[in-house]
UniProtKB/Swiss-Prot annotation:
Cofactor(s) needed: FAD
NCBIfam families in the record: PRK06183.1-2, PRK06183.1-3, PRK06183.1-5
EC id: 1.14.13.127
Gene name, Swiss-Prot/TrEMBL: mhpA
PANTHER family: 3-(3-HYDROXY-PHENYL)PROPIONATE/3-HYDROXYCINNAMIC ACID HYDROXYLASE, FAD-BINDING MONOOXYGENASE
Name used for this protein in its record: 3-(3-hydroxy-phenyl)propionate/3-hydroxycinnamic acid hydroxylase
Lineage of source species: Bacteria, Bacillati, Actinomycetota, Actinomycetes, Mycobacteriales
Source organism: Mycobacterium sp. (strain JLS)
Family matches, as SUPFAM superfamilies: FAD/NAD(P)-binding domain (SSF51905)
Amino acid sequence: MTPATERDDTDTDVVIVGAGPVGLTLANILGLQGVRTMIVEERATLIDYPRGVGLDDEALRTFQAIGLVDKVLPHTVPNQILRFFDGNRRLLAEMAPPDARFGWPKRNGFVQPMVDAELHAGLARFPHVEVRWGHRMAECEETADGVTVRLDGDPTPVRARYLVGCDGGRSATRRLMGVSFDGTTSPTRWLVVDIANDPLGHPNSEVGADPARPYASISIAHGIRRFEFMIHADETDEQAEDPAFIHRMLGLLVPHPERVEVIRHRVYTHHSRIAGAFRKGRMFLAGDAAHLMPVWQGQGYNSGIRDAANLGWKLAAVVDGRAGDALLDTYDVERRKHARAMIDLSTMVGRVISPTNRHVAAVRDKLIRGASVVPTLKRYVLEMRFKPMPRYEQGAVFHPEAPSPTSPAGTLFIQPRVDSRDAQNVLLDEVLGTGFAVLCWNNNPRALLGADLFDRWKALGARFVAARPLTQLHWTGHDDPDVTVIGDRTGALKGWFDAHAESVLFLRPDRCIAGACIAQRAPEVSTALFGVLHLTQGGGNGHHGADRPVLHVAQSATEPSGTVAGTP
């Protein structure tokens, strides 16, 4: 059955269960690719209170790719510093990562309801994307070529090719799939209180590793501050939610707790869990439905956005006929290992922060202070080098031999600012577009690949980019109408290629390096990639590249970048 025929036999291509940030991001990715998408959400509207409070550089890069980063940025606090204090309020450690190698700051406070609202508003660009509010998925039956979804209160089933459960930790999709959710739930409880008209007012965040009562104080944006306090074992949930108790907790950090304006408060526990499979047949899990982690690294929200970025382009390629269904198996292969690493890191940091035994806390403090006098260890913490970065050894990547720790294939490519002949000081992804890209240093991709392979990538909607020193930008000796020439404005591209032997990169739509090689090996690596990416010979049925309803919304070339998106 051809993809076009399958599209005629279904009501939509992809059903997404859940209109949270992961489902909304995935719907925007699919919408940009011309994929018919339906979100079903049992709530009547978006959740209007904050849950996540931190965005990282990878999430902002994804929002850039879907053309919404300019809408999101006003609701963020970029380059947010996080400080850790001991029980005597002496500084233990500080996280202030200075670089923006992926185009955006590594740490950003944000107001989740406002960002989610922008993600939802972005769907209005796509007539082929629909959100059904107030509809709960009752059941989902898989058939040979799709899924049939039944919604409560609607007698007409929805037929789709694939279903993605983005429906949270209590995922109905996961239960219907019969997938386990292994892990642990911490016995420790926390009181979270969100405050309007920030009573402290400073722009950064802190964690108090006080054995008497660990706490967190987080600046979000728009005058909102979040406080979190550990609840002792002898304190009940009812006590913790009593206004007098809340005022007593706030009084530890605020001079007049009775004057604060509480947005909401609740008691919660930390979960460290991961689904037994992210894919089963034509059904997938993403976000909290696939994994839950403690809040200490602020990676729950960001890990879900990574899921959407990884799965979205693969679904679009398969639905459009540009790739075979086997490409979708790489979603689980690639995302599971990294999600597990994030869970383990977040769990470990929580254990470091929250011991209530004073002797254990004292030993911890001495170890951290001892490490801080070693420059390499201090930079390791300051620059957040401990954060696990995706490095795919298997999946939709090609390694000609066993990957080494320095192999670029399977890693996320940098995003410096560059000049083209049409624009100056733009982020690299604005030139690369939102599909596949072939990027080489100081060479012509057509000459390296040969006509047949070049045309095959072109049929898949790939962009071809030749990076040069800025001094060579306007030299026209090797001009090619299908190749965009960029000038290395900051020297970051030359620095990257100088540090690696590879000079030709094949970039996936999520900007992961699918394959890399020296110039002479470009044809053989290209051919191998068509295999591991399960790409089709014909190039699909025309919904990629310039035929998409919206490719991207370019960011302003004059945007100040020193504090937000890298130094020009």
